[in-house]
Amino acid sequence: MIRISDAAQAHFAKLLASQEEGTQIRVFVINPGTPNAECGVSYCPPDAVEATDTALKFDLLTAYVDELSAPYLEDAEIDFVTDQLGSQLTLKAPNAKMRKVADDAPLMERVEYMLQSQINPQLAGHGGRVTLMEITDEGYAILQFGGGCNGCSMVDVTLKEGIEKQLLNEFPELKGVRDLTEHQRGEHSYY
């Protein structure tokens, strides 16, 4: 469910050493399955463990996950990264905003999941996003761009060289992608 790197475990163990004996960590998602989902890690003293929690035992600690958060923390990773600028704890939870869909789910759901979990986080760096409008009977994914992607001069490259290649690689049943957006260049446009 959750992978915690050795460096992150060591960091948590150091923090836990100054807490009440038996205190571990809790990993959770607030507003799971929504665009406002946020992940967090907190101390979990022994009296805060619920019977419905999942206990994930690691070498140096135990991480507790509540039953509501559990499906949204599938494939989550926690790491402790150190570079020239210092150290930071990172928590990546690709399914926090949308539950992972089954491999045999309808094509529309699988494409939507990939857009939300893999493509949109990349576009968000430019203030952009893409929405799946439909999949045609001919096998084309019809997309609409928003935010910084709307009116961006690089949108065709993003569509064909980025999004289309990733989608066709993952979903061979698709024939391609088409852009439905009425692009209007403005202050919001990234390029």
UniProtKB/Swiss-Prot annotation:
SUPFAM superfamilies: Fe-S cluster assembly (FSCA) domain-like (SSF117916), HesB-like domain (SSF89360). It holds the Pfam family NifU. This is Fe/S biogenesis protein NfuA. One of its GO terms (molecular function) is iron ion binding. Involved in iron-sulfur cluster biogenesis. Binds a 4Fe-4S cluster, can transfer this cluster to apoproteins, and thereby intervenes in the maturation of Fe/S proteins. Could also act as a scaffold/chaperone for damaged Fe/S proteins. Keywords: 4Fe-4S, Iron, Iron-sulfur, Metal-binding. Binds 1 [4Fe-4S] cluster per subunit. The cluster is presumably bound at the interface of two monomers. Its cofactor is [4Fe-4S] cluster. Coiled coil: none annotated. Homodimer. It comes from the Bacteria. The gene is nfuA. Gene3D superfamilies: Fe-S cluster assembly (FSCA), HesB-like domain. Belongs to the NfuA family. It comes from Cronobacter sakazakii (strain ATCC BAA-894) (Enterobacter sakazakii).
